[in-house]
Curated annotation (Swiss-Prot):
Keyword Hydrolase among record annotations: yes
Pathway membership, UniProt: Purine metabolism; ppGpp biosynthesis; ppGpp from GTP: step 2/2
Taxonomic lineage from the root: Bacteria, Pseudomonadati, Pseudomonadota, Gammaproteobacteria, Vibrionales
Keyword ATP-binding among record annotations: no
Example GO molecular function: guanosine-5'-triphosphate,3'-diphosphate diphosphatase activity
Name listed for the protein in its UniProt record: Guanosine-5'-triphosphate,3'-diphosphate pyrophosphatase
Gene: gppA
Protein's organism: Vibrio parahaemolyticus serotype O3:K6 (strain RIMD 2210633)
Keywords: Hydrolase
Classification via InterPro entries: ATPase_NBD (IPR043129), GppA/Ppx_hydrolase (IPR050273), Guo-5TP_3DP_PyrP (IPR023709), Ppx_GppA_C (IPR048950), Ppx_GppA_N (IPR003695), PyroPPase_GppA_Ppx (IPR030673)
NCBIfam families on file: PRK11031.1
Length: 497
Protein backbone atom coordinates (compact mmCIF):
# COMPACT_ATOMS: atom_id res chain seq x y z
CA UNK A 1 0.00 0.00 0.00
CA UNK A 2 1.28 3.40 -0.85
CA UNK A 3 0.62 6.22 1.55
CA UNK A 4 -0.64 9.23 -0.37
CA UNK A 5 -0.25 12.40 1.65
CA UNK A 6 -3.63 13.75 0.57
CA UNK A 7 -5.46 10.47 1.15
CA UNK A 8 -4.25 8.95 4.43
CA UNK A 9 -5.03 5.36 5.34
CA UNK A 10 -6.67 4.33 8.61
CA UNK A 11 -7.08 0.88 10.14
CA UNK A 12 -9.49 -0.35 12.80
CA UNK A 13 -9.21 -3.85 14.27
CA UNK A 14 -11.90 -5.44 16.42
CA UNK A 15 -10.86 -8.53 18.39
CA UNK A 16 -14.36 -9.89 18.87
CA UNK A 17 -15.58 -12.93 20.74
CA UNK A 18 -16.65 -14.74 17.58
CA UNK A 19 -14.56 -13.15 14.82
CA UNK A 20 -11.58 -10.84 14.42
CA UNK A 21 -12.20 -8.04 11.92
CA UNK A 22 -9.90 -5.55 10.22
CA UNK A 23 -11.12 -2.49 8.32
CA UNK A 24 -8.76 -0.34 6.22
CA UNK A 25 -10.12 2.91 4.80
CA UNK A 26 -8.87 5.94 2.94
CA UNK A 27 -9.99 9.44 3.88
CA UNK A 28 -10.89 11.19 0.64
CA UNK A 29 -13.22 14.01 -0.42
CA UNK A 30 -14.84 14.40 2.98
CA UNK A 31 -15.71 10.73 3.29
CA UNK A 32 -14.09 7.34 3.79
CA UNK A 33 -13.42 4.80 1.07
CA UNK A 34 -13.09 1.18 2.14
CA UNK A 35 -9.80 -0.29 0.92
CA UNK A 36 -9.90 -3.67 2.67
CA UNK A 37 -12.11 -5.75 4.94
CA UNK A 38 -10.62 -8.87 6.48
CA UNK A 39 -12.54 -11.24 8.73
CA UNK A 40 -11.47 -14.46 10.39
CA UNK A 41 -13.69 -16.72 12.51
CA UNK A 42 -11.66 -17.21 15.70
CA UNK A 43 -14.46 -18.09 18.18
CA UNK A 44 -12.44 -16.81 21.10
CA UNK A 45 -15.39 -17.06 23.50
CA UNK A 46 -15.63 -20.81 22.90
CA UNK A 47 -12.17 -21.09 24.46
CA UNK A 48 -13.26 -19.86 27.91
CA UNK A 49 -13.51 -22.57 30.59
CA UNK A 50 -15.66 -22.53 33.73
CA UNK A 51 -13.06 -20.33 35.44
CA UNK A 52 -13.00 -17.87 32.51
CA UNK A 53 -9.51 -18.92 31.55
CA UNK A 54 -8.80 -18.75 27.83
CA UNK A 55 -7.49 -22.01 26.37
CA UNK A 56 -4.14 -22.10 24.62
CA UNK A 57 -5.88 -23.38 21.47
CA UNK A 58 -8.19 -20.35 21.36
CA UNK A 59 -5.29 -17.97 21.97
CA UNK A 60 -3.31 -19.61 19.17
CA UNK A 61 -6.24 -19.14 16.77
CA UNK A 62 -6.21 -15.46 17.70
CA UNK A 63 -2.44 -15.11 17.28
CA UNK A 64 -2.53 -16.83 13.90
CA UNK A 65 -5.17 -14.37 12.73
CA UNK A 66 -3.24 -11.35 14.01
CA UNK A 67 -0.16 -12.52 12.10
CA UNK A 68 -2.20 -12.05 8.92
CA UNK A 69 -3.44 -8.64 10.01
CA UNK A 70 0.08 -7.47 10.87
CA UNK A 71 1.13 -7.51 7.23
CA UNK A 72 -1.53 -4.93 6.31
CA UNK A 73 -0.53 -2.58 9.15
CA UNK A 74 3.07 -2.08 8.04
CA UNK A 75 2.46 0.98 5.84
CA UNK A 76 -0.16 2.72 7.99
CA UNK A 77 0.96 5.42 10.46
CA UNK A 78 0.70 4.35 14.08
CA UNK A 79 -1.56 7.29 14.94
CA UNK A 80 -4.02 6.07 12.29
CA UNK A 81 -4.47 2.62 13.85
CA UNK A 82 -6.93 1.54 16.58
CA UNK A 83 -7.05 -2.03 17.90
CA UNK A 84 -9.62 -2.98 20.52
CA UNK A 85 -10.59 -6.12 22.37
CA UNK A 86 -14.15 -6.68 23.55
CA UNK A 87 -16.22 -9.03 25.73
CA UNK A 88 -14.10 -12.19 25.82
CA UNK A 89 -10.88 -10.30 26.46
CA UNK A 90 -12.69 -8.32 29.18
CA UNK A 91 -13.70 -11.60 30.82
CA UNK A 92 -10.58 -13.76 30.40
CA UNK A 93 -8.60 -14.12 33.62
CA UNK A 94 -5.41 -14.80 31.66
CA UNK A 95 -5.87 -11.98 29.17
CA UNK A 96 -2.34 -10.69 29.87
CA UNK A 97 -0.87 -13.86 28.36
CA UNK A 98 -2.81 -13.32 25.15
CA UNK A 99 -2.09 -9.59 24.96
CA UNK A 100 1.65 -9.89 25.51
CA UNK A 101 2.15 -11.99 22.40
CA UNK A 102 -0.59 -10.19 20.43
CA UNK A 103 1.11 -6.84 20.99
CA UNK A 104 4.40 -8.30 19.77
CA UNK A 105 2.78 -9.68 16.62
CA UNK A 106 1.04 -6.43 15.70
CA UNK A 107 3.67 -4.02 16.92
CA UNK A 108 0.80 -1.89 18.19
CA UNK A 109 -0.95 -1.59 21.56
CA UNK A 110 -4.30 -3.33 22.01
CA UNK A 111 -6.97 -1.60 24.09
CA UNK A 112 -9.38 -3.86 25.97
CA UNK A 113 -12.36 -1.52 26.16
CA UNK A 114 -15.20 -1.60 28.69
CA UNK A 115 -18.68 -2.66 27.68
CA UNK A 116 -19.91 0.92 27.96
CA UNK A 117 -17.06 2.22 25.79
CA UNK A 118 -17.79 -0.49 23.24
CA UNK A 119 -21.45 0.55 23.16
CA UNK A 120 -20.51 4.22 22.76
CA UNK A 121 -18.16 3.44 19.87
CA UNK A 122 -20.77 1.25 18.18
CA UNK A 123 -23.23 4.13 18.40
CA UNK A 124 -20.73 6.48 16.75
CA UNK A 125 -20.30 4.00 13.92
CA UNK A 126 -24.05 3.77 13.43
CA UNK A 127 -24.60 7.54 13.70
CA UNK A 128 -21.95 8.24 11.06
CA UNK A 129 -23.16 5.66 8.55
CA UNK A 130 -26.94 5.39 8.95
CA UNK A 131 -29.51 7.90 7.75
CA UNK A 132 -32.79 8.90 9.31
CA UNK A 133 -33.84 11.34 11.99
CA UNK A 134 -35.24 11.05 15.48
CA UNK A 135 -34.21 8.89 18.39
CA UNK A 136 -32.78 5.48 17.49
CA UNK A 137 -32.37 2.20 19.34
CA UNK A 138 -29.22 0.36 18.26
CA UNK A 139 -28.83 -3.40 18.81
CA UNK A 140 -25.48 -5.14 18.32
CA UNK A 141 -25.33 -8.88 19.07
CA UNK A 142 -21.73 -10.00 19.39
CA UNK A 143 -20.14 -13.30 20.29
CA UNK A 144 -20.18 -12.81 24.07
CA UNK A 145 -21.99 -9.52 24.63
CA UNK A 146 -24.96 -7.62 23.28
CA UNK A 147 -24.97 -3.83 23.23
CA UNK A 148 -28.19 -1.84 23.43
CA UNK A 149 -27.93 1.91 22.87
CA UNK A 150 -30.47 4.70 22.62
CA UNK A 151 -29.29 7.93 21.07
CA UNK A 152 -30.20 10.91 18.95
CA UNK A 153 -27.91 12.45 16.35
CA UNK A 154 -24.37 11.79 17.58
CA UNK A 155 -25.31 11.72 21.28
CA UNK A 156 -25.91 8.43 23.07
CA UNK A 157 -28.46 8.75 25.88
CA UNK A 158 -28.33 5.17 27.24
CA UNK A 159 -25.48 2.67 26.90
CA UNK A 160 -25.66 -0.96 28.01
CA UNK A 161 -23.49 -3.99 27.36
CA UNK A 162 -25.19 -7.26 28.37
CA UNK A 163 -23.35 -10.52 29.00
CA UNK A 164 -24.99 -12.58 26.30
CA UNK A 165 -23.87 -13.30 22.76
CA UNK A 166 -24.29 -15.74 19.91
CA UNK A 167 -21.27 -17.86 20.95
CA UNK A 168 -22.05 -17.99 24.68
CA UNK A 169 -25.76 -18.64 24.00
CA UNK A 170 -24.74 -21.44 21.64
CA UNK A 171 -22.77 -23.10 24.42
CA UNK A 172 -25.40 -22.39 27.10
CA UNK A 173 -28.59 -23.39 25.27
CA UNK A 174 -27.67 -25.34 22.14
CA UNK A 175 -24.80 -27.39 23.54
CA UNK A 176 -26.47 -30.61 22.37
CA UNK A 177 -26.80 -29.00 18.90
CA UNK A 178 -30.52 -29.85 18.81
CA UNK A 179 -32.80 -27.26 17.17
CA UNK A 180 -35.97 -28.08 19.07
CA UNK A 181 -38.63 -25.92 20.71
CA UNK A 182 -37.23 -26.58 24.20
CA UNK A 183 -33.79 -25.19 23.37
CA UNK A 184 -35.18 -22.16 21.54
CA UNK A 185 -37.60 -21.36 24.37
CA UNK A 186 -34.83 -21.64 26.95
CA UNK A 187 -32.50 -19.41 24.90
CA UNK A 188 -35.20 -16.78 24.37
CA UNK A 189 -36.22 -16.81 28.03
CA UNK A 190 -32.58 -16.61 29.13
CA UNK A 191 -32.11 -13.54 26.96
CA UNK A 192 -35.25 -11.93 28.36
CA UNK A 193 -34.02 -12.41 31.92
CA UNK A 194 -30.74 -10.75 30.95
CA UNK A 195 -32.52 -7.76 29.39
CA UNK A 196 -35.15 -7.21 32.13
CA UNK A 197 -32.97 -5.07 34.47
CA UNK A 198 -32.72 -2.32 31.82
CA UNK A 199 -36.23 -2.69 30.39
CA UNK A 200 -37.87 0.16 32.30
CA UNK A 201 -35.07 2.63 31.56
CA UNK A 202 -35.20 1.91 27.83
CA UNK A 203 -38.97 1.93 27.45
CA UNK A 204 -39.15 5.20 29.39
CA UNK A 205 -36.62 6.81 27.05
CA UNK A 206 -38.33 5.43 23.94
CA UNK A 207 -37.15 5.58 20.33
CA UNK A 208 -38.42 6.34 16.84
CA UNK A 209 -36.42 3.84 14.78
CA UNK A 210 -34.52 0.65 15.53
CA UNK A 211 -31.36 -0.48 13.74
CA UNK A 212 -29.30 -3.64 14.05
CA UNK A 213 -25.53 -3.43 13.77
CA UNK A 214 -24.31 -7.02 13.97
CA UNK A 215 -23.50 -10.06 11.89
CA UNK A 216 -26.69 -11.69 13.15
CA UNK A 217 -28.82 -8.88 11.72
CA UNK A 218 -26.84 -8.88 8.47
CA UNK A 219 -27.34 -12.64 8.13
CA UNK A 220 -31.08 -12.23 8.72
CA UNK A 221 -31.33 -9.56 6.05
CA UNK A 222 -29.41 -11.71 3.55
CA UNK A 223 -31.78 -14.62 4.24
CA UNK A 224 -34.88 -12.46 3.84
CA UNK A 225 -33.69 -10.97 0.56
CA UNK A 226 -32.76 -14.43 -0.75
CA UNK A 227 -36.29 -15.59 0.09
CA UNK A 228 -37.95 -12.65 -1.68
CA UNK A 229 -38.82 -10.63 1.43
CA UNK A 230 -37.99 -6.96 1.92
CA UNK A 231 -35.08 -5.84 4.11
CA UNK A 232 -37.13 -4.73 7.12
CA UNK A 233 -36.86 -7.19 10.02
CA UNK A 234 -40.09 -7.84 11.95
CA UNK A 235 -41.09 -10.22 14.74
CA UNK A 236 -43.23 -12.30 12.38
CA UNK A 237 -40.27 -12.79 10.04
CA UNK A 238 -38.03 -13.83 12.95
CA UNK A 239 -40.57 -16.44 14.07
CA UNK A 240 -40.88 -17.68 10.50
CA UNK A 241 -37.10 -18.18 10.37
CA UNK A 242 -37.20 -19.95 13.74
CA UNK A 243 -39.69 -22.43 12.26
CA UNK A 244 -37.41 -22.93 9.26
CA UNK A 245 -34.47 -23.60 11.59
CA UNK A 246 -36.49 -26.14 13.59
CA UNK A 247 -37.11 -28.18 10.43
CA UNK A 248 -33.55 -29.40 10.96
CA UNK A 249 -33.16 -31.73 13.92
CA UNK A 250 -29.53 -30.85 14.54
CA UNK A 251 -27.42 -27.74 14.00
CA UNK A 252 -25.16 -29.58 11.55
CA UNK A 253 -28.21 -30.18 9.32
CA UNK A 254 -29.34 -26.54 9.30
CA UNK A 255 -30.18 -25.52 5.74
CA UNK A 256 -32.00 -22.22 5.27
CA UNK A 257 -32.09 -20.47 1.90
CA UNK A 258 -29.76 -17.46 2.08
CA UNK A 259 -27.84 -18.61 5.19
CA UNK A 260 -24.13 -19.08 4.57
CA UNK A 261 -22.26 -22.02 6.06
CA UNK A 262 -19.96 -19.58 7.86
CA UNK A 263 -22.85 -18.05 9.82
CA UNK A 264 -24.87 -21.25 10.38
CA UNK A 265 -23.24 -22.34 13.66
CA UNK A 266 -24.24 -19.27 15.67
CA UNK A 267 -27.41 -18.41 13.74
CA UNK A 268 -29.97 -20.10 16.08
CA UNK A 269 -28.43 -18.55 19.19
CA UNK A 270 -28.25 -15.08 17.64
CA UNK A 271 -31.82 -15.46 16.36
CA UNK A 272 -33.03 -16.38 19.86
CA UNK A 273 -31.45 -13.27 21.38
CA UNK A 274 -33.00 -11.05 18.73
CA UNK A 275 -36.45 -12.59 19.20
CA UNK A 276 -36.19 -11.89 22.95
CA UNK A 277 -35.21 -8.27 22.28
CA UNK A 278 -38.12 -7.81 19.87
CA UNK A 279 -40.64 -9.34 22.28
CA UNK A 280 -39.48 -7.65 25.48
CA UNK A 281 -38.92 -4.19 23.98
CA UNK A 282 -41.96 -4.55 21.68
CA UNK A 283 -39.99 -3.56 18.58
CA UNK A 284 -42.09 -3.14 15.43
CA UNK A 285 -39.34 -3.11 12.82
CA UNK A 286 -35.56 -3.07 12.49
CA UNK A 287 -33.23 -2.19 9.62
CA UNK A 288 -29.54 -2.90 9.15
CA UNK A 289 -27.12 -0.16 10.22
CA UNK A 290 -24.42 1.04 7.86
CA UNK A 291 -21.61 0.50 10.37
CA UNK A 292 -20.78 -0.32 13.98
CA UNK A 293 -17.68 -0.75 16.16
CA UNK A 294 -14.96 -0.63 13.50
CA UNK A 295 -16.56 2.30 11.73
CA UNK A 296 -16.89 4.07 15.06
CA UNK A 297 -13.17 3.63 15.68
CA UNK A 298 -12.38 5.13 12.27
CA UNK A 299 -14.65 8.13 12.74
CA UNK A 300 -13.09 8.79 16.15
CA UNK A 301 -9.73 9.12 14.40
CA UNK A 302 -10.98 11.41 11.59
CA UNK A 303 -12.41 14.49 13.32
CA UNK A 304 -13.33 16.39 10.15
CA UNK A 305 -15.90 13.73 9.21
CA UNK A 306 -18.22 14.80 12.02
CA UNK A 307 -21.28 16.23 10.27
CA UNK A 308 -24.83 16.05 11.53
CA UNK A 309 -26.46 15.23 8.18
CA UNK A 310 -24.91 11.92 7.09
CA UNK A 311 -26.74 11.87 3.77
CA UNK A 312 -25.68 15.44 2.95
CA UNK A 313 -22.07 14.45 3.63
CA UNK A 314 -22.42 11.42 1.37
CA UNK A 315 -23.93 13.43 -1.49
CA UNK A 316 -21.23 16.09 -1.18
CA UNK A 317 -18.50 13.45 -1.18
CA UNK A 318 -19.86 11.69 -4.29
CA UNK A 319 -20.29 15.01 -6.12
CA UNK A 320 -16.70 15.93 -5.33
CA UNK A 321 -15.22 12.55 -6.20
CA UNK A 322 -17.01 12.35 -9.56
CA UNK A 323 -16.80 16.09 -10.34
CA UNK A 324 -20.56 16.47 -10.70
CA UNK A 325 -22.22 19.81 -11.37
CA UNK A 326 -23.40 20.59 -7.83
CA UNK A 327 -25.29 23.75 -8.82
CA UNK A 328 -27.24 21.92 -11.49
CA UNK A 329 -27.99 19.03 -9.14
CA UNK A 330 -29.36 21.55 -6.65
CA UNK A 331 -31.43 23.17 -9.41
CA UNK A 332 -33.02 19.85 -10.41
CA UNK A 333 -33.66 18.94 -6.76
CA UNK A 334 -35.27 22.33 -6.05
CA UNK A 335 -37.60 22.13 -9.04
CA UNK A 336 -38.49 18.49 -8.32
CA UNK A 337 -39.36 19.50 -4.75
CA UNK A 338 -41.48 22.39 -6.05
CA UNK A 339 -43.35 20.07 -8.42
CA UNK A 340 -43.95 17.65 -5.55
CA UNK A 341 -45.49 20.38 -3.41
CA UNK A 342 -47.74 21.45 -6.28
CA UNK A 343 -48.84 17.84 -6.80
CA UNK A 344 -49.89 17.53 -3.16
CA UNK A 345 -46.69 17.04 -1.15
CA UNK A 346 -46.88 14.24 1.39
CA UNK A 347 -50.45 13.49 0.37
CA UNK A 348 -49.21 12.56 -3.10
CA UNK A 349 -46.00 10.81 -2.00
CA UNK A 350 -46.90 9.53 1.45
CA UNK A 351 -43.55 8.25 2.74
CA UNK A 352 -41.12 10.91 4.05
CA UNK A 353 -38.30 8.85 2.52
CA UNK A 354 -39.83 9.44 -0.91
CA UNK A 355 -38.94 13.13 -0.83
CA UNK A 356 -35.45 12.36 0.50
CA UNK A 357 -34.78 9.82 -2.26
CA UNK A 358 -36.13 12.18 -4.93
CA UNK A 359 -33.74 14.90 -3.75
CA UNK A 360 -30.80 12.49 -3.61
CA UNK A 361 -31.38 11.15 -7.11
CA UNK A 362 -31.82 14.68 -8.48
CA UNK A 363 -28.41 15.66 -7.12
CA UNK A 364 -26.61 12.52 -8.31
CA UNK A 365 -28.45 11.40 -11.46
CA UNK A 366 -25.71 12.59 -13.85
CA UNK A 367 -22.96 10.51 -12.23
CA UNK A 368 -23.02 8.04 -15.13
CA UNK A 369 -21.94 10.77 -17.56
CA UNK A 370 -18.47 10.56 -16.03
CA UNK A 371 -18.18 7.21 -17.83
CA UNK A 372 -20.09 7.80 -21.08
CA UNK A 373 -23.03 9.85 -22.36
CA UNK A 374 -24.60 7.19 -24.57
CA UNK A 375 -25.52 4.89 -21.68
CA UNK A 376 -25.43 7.52 -18.96
CA UNK A 377 -28.49 6.18 -17.17
CA UNK A 378 -27.15 2.62 -17.12
CA UNK A 379 -23.82 3.81 -15.73
CA UNK A 380 -25.57 5.98 -13.13
CA UNK A 381 -27.59 2.99 -11.96
CA UNK A 382 -24.51 0.79 -11.65
CA UNK A 383 -22.50 3.36 -9.71
CA UNK A 384 -25.28 4.39 -7.33
CA UNK A 385 -26.21 0.79 -6.57
CA UNK A 386 -22.62 -0.29 -5.94
CA UNK A 387 -20.95 2.70 -4.29
CA UNK A 388 -20.70 2.83 -0.50
CA UNK A 389 -23.31 5.47 0.38
CA UNK A 390 -23.41 6.03 4.16
CA UNK A 391 -26.90 6.98 5.26
CA UNK A 392 -28.69 4.85 2.66
CA UNK A 393 -29.84 1.25 2.99
CA UNK A 394 -29.33 -1.41 0.34
CA UNK A 395 -32.96 -1.09 -0.78
CA UNK A 396 -32.66 2.69 -1.02
CA UNK A 397 -29.48 2.44 -3.11
CA UNK A 398 -31.22 0.02 -5.47
CA UNK A 399 -34.17 2.39 -5.80
CA UNK A 400 -32.00 5.48 -6.40
CA UNK A 401 -30.13 3.57 -9.10
CA UNK A 402 -33.31 2.45 -10.87
CA UNK A 403 -34.68 6.01 -10.88
CA UNK A 404 -31.37 7.38 -12.21
CA UNK A 405 -31.35 4.67 -14.90
CA UNK A 406 -34.59 6.17 -16.27
CA UNK A 407 -33.97 9.90 -15.79
CA UNK A 408 -34.21 10.70 -19.52
CA UNK A 409 -35.27 9.38 -22.92
CA UNK A 410 -36.87 5.90 -23.07
CA UNK A 411 -39.21 5.15 -20.18
CA UNK A 412 -39.93 1.73 -18.70
CA UNK A 413 -41.80 0.59 -15.60
CA UNK A 414 -39.80 0.24 -12.41
CA UNK A 415 -38.82 -3.23 -11.16
CA UNK A 416 -39.91 -4.51 -7.76
CA UNK A 417 -38.18 -2.58 -5.01
CA UNK A 418 -38.57 -2.28 -1.24
CA UNK A 419 -37.55 1.31 -0.45
CA UNK A 420 -41.01 2.90 -0.78
CA UNK A 421 -44.42 1.88 -2.13
CA UNK A 422 -44.82 1.17 -5.83
CA UNK A 423 -47.17 4.13 -6.25
CA UNK A 424 -44.73 6.55 -4.61
CA UNK A 425 -41.83 5.08 -6.59
CA UNK A 426 -43.36 5.80 -9.99
CA UNK A 427 -44.31 9.30 -8.83
CA UNK A 428 -40.71 10.02 -7.82
CA UNK A 429 -39.57 8.92 -11.28
CA UNK A 430 -42.17 11.08 -13.05
CA UNK A 431 -41.17 14.18 -11.08
CA UNK A 432 -37.46 13.65 -11.70
CA UNK A 433 -37.94 13.26 -15.46
CA UNK A 434 -40.00 16.45 -15.64
CA UNK A 435 -37.50 18.39 -13.52
CA UNK A 436 -34.61 17.25 -15.74
CA UNK A 437 -36.46 18.30 -18.91
CA UNK A 438 -37.43 21.70 -17.54
CA UNK A 439 -33.88 22.54 -16.36
CA UNK A 440 -31.93 21.50 -19.44
CA UNK A 441 -30.54 25.05 -19.88
CA UNK A 442 -28.90 24.60 -16.44
CA UNK A 443 -29.73 28.10 -15.26
CA UNK A 444 -32.51 28.71 -12.69
CA UNK A 445 -33.28 32.14 -14.15
CA UNK A 446 -34.19 30.50 -17.48
CA UNK A 447 -36.70 28.04 -16.02
CA UNK A 448 -40.35 28.48 -17.02
CA UNK A 449 -43.20 29.26 -14.66
CA UNK A 450 -44.99 25.95 -14.17
CA UNK A 451 -47.97 24.57 -12.30
CA UNK A 452 -48.46 20.84 -11.75
CA UNK A 453 -51.93 19.52 -10.95
CA UNK A 454 -52.33 15.93 -9.77
CA UNK A 455 -55.57 13.96 -9.68
CA UNK A 456 -54.32 10.60 -8.46
CA UNK A 457 -51.90 9.46 -11.16
CA UNK A 458 -53.26 11.88 -13.75
CA UNK A 459 -50.91 14.86 -14.11
CA UNK A 460 -51.49 18.15 -15.89
CA UNK A 461 -48.44 20.39 -16.32
CA UNK A 462 -49.22 24.00 -17.21
CA UNK A 463 -46.32 26.01 -18.65
CA UNK A 464 -46.02 29.66 -19.63
CA UNK A 465 -47.03 29.90 -23.32
CA UNK A 466 -44.39 32.50 -24.21
CA UNK A 467 -41.67 30.30 -22.75
CA UNK A 468 -42.85 27.34 -24.84
CA UNK A 469 -42.74 29.51 -27.97
CA UNK A 470 -39.22 30.66 -27.14
CA UNK A 471 -38.03 27.10 -26.39
CA UNK A 472 -39.44 24.93 -29.21
CA UNK A 473 -37.00 22.06 -28.64
CA UNK A 474 -38.00 21.68 -24.99
CA UNK A 475 -41.66 22.04 -25.97
CA UNK A 476 -41.27 19.15 -28.40
CA UNK A 477 -39.45 17.04 -25.81
CA UNK A 478 -42.23 17.69 -23.29
CA UNK A 479 -44.81 16.42 -25.79
CA UNK A 480 -42.73 13.29 -26.31
CA UNK A 481 -42.50 12.86 -22.53
CA UNK A 482 -46.27 13.24 -22.27
CA UNK A 483 -46.70 10.39 -24.74
CA UNK A 484 -44.10 8.20 -23.00
CA UNK A 485 -45.71 8.51 -19.58
CA UNK A 486 -49.24 8.16 -20.93
CA UNK A 487 -48.30 5.08 -22.99
CA UNK A 488 -47.32 3.10 -19.87
CA UNK A 489 -50.43 4.12 -17.96
CA UNK A 490 -49.21 7.32 -16.29
CA UNK A 491 -51.41 10.04 -17.87
CA UNK A 492 -49.58 13.34 -18.45
CA UNK A 493 -51.00 16.38 -20.22
CA UNK A 494 -48.93 19.44 -21.15
CA UNK A 495 -50.86 22.72 -21.51
CA UNK A 496 -49.83 26.30 -22.30
CA UNK A 497 -51.10 29.06 -20.06
Amino acid sequence: MSQAGSSPLYAAIDLGSNSFHMLVVRHIDGSVQTMAKIKRKVRLAAGLDEHNSLSMEAMQRGWDCLSLFAERLQDIPTQNIRIVGTATLRTATNVDVFLEKANQILGQPIEVISGEEEAATIYKGVAHTSGGSGRRLVVDIGGASTELIIGEGFEAKALTSLKMGCVTWLENFFKDRQLNARNFEAAIEGAKQTIKPILEQYTDLGWDVCVGASGTVQALQEIMLAQGMDEVITHSKLKRLQKQAMLADHLEELDIEGLTLERALVFPSGLSILIAIFELLEIDAMTLAGGALREGLVYEMVDELRQNDIRARTICSVQSRYQLDCQYGEQVATLAGKLLEQAGGDEWIAEPQGKVLLETTAKLHEIGLTIDFKKGGEHSAYLLQNLDLPGYTRAQKFFIGEIARRYREQLSSLPEQHAISGTSAKRVLRLLRLAVLLTHRRNPSLEPQVELLAEGDKLTLSIDAKWLEANPLTAAELEIESNRQTDIGWPLTITAC
